[in-house]
Amino acid sequence: MASARRRRIKKKKQVISKKIEFRYRGYTLEELQQMPLREFAKLLPARQRRTLLRGLTPQQKKLAMKIKKARRLLNKGKEPRIIRTHCRDFVITPDMVGLTFGVYNGKEFVEVKVTPEMIGHYLGEFSLTRKPVQHGAPGMGATRSSMFVPIK
């Protein structure tokens, strides 16, 4: 009885420790990186697919050239610098995985390290343009009802 319980616990630990391989629509990261861009676009949701198939704007072409240059450096074993860009509407493709981008949010460049889970999203989704509101304690003059809050 006790040995069967120990075997079940051991089996659970083995399942938990097993690393799950990333897949996007049934394809591994290596398969996606070998795939041509038009073929990859067919796997994307409609909005991203349309964006890629319509072609790149001059700003996006410039960013694509920077990505190719950084990818070559990464393949040689050198660490590429952060790629700074204002282009928030660029769809994250498999060849961008592992690179670091500085995405402009209207005030500063937010550092975005691209992981496989980000494939198919836009760069701008990971660089928030608005700061989340952090409400403070109510004080005098905050609202009409705050006049009844005792002054410290």
Curated annotation (Swiss-Prot):
The keyword rRNA-binding applies. PROSITE patterns: RIBOSOMAL_S19. Signal peptide: none annotated. This is Small ribosomal subunit protein uS19. Gene3D superfamilies: 30s Ribosomal Protein S19, Chain A. Belongs to the universal ribosomal protein uS19 family. The gene is rps19. GO terms for biological process: ribosomal small subunit assembly; translation.
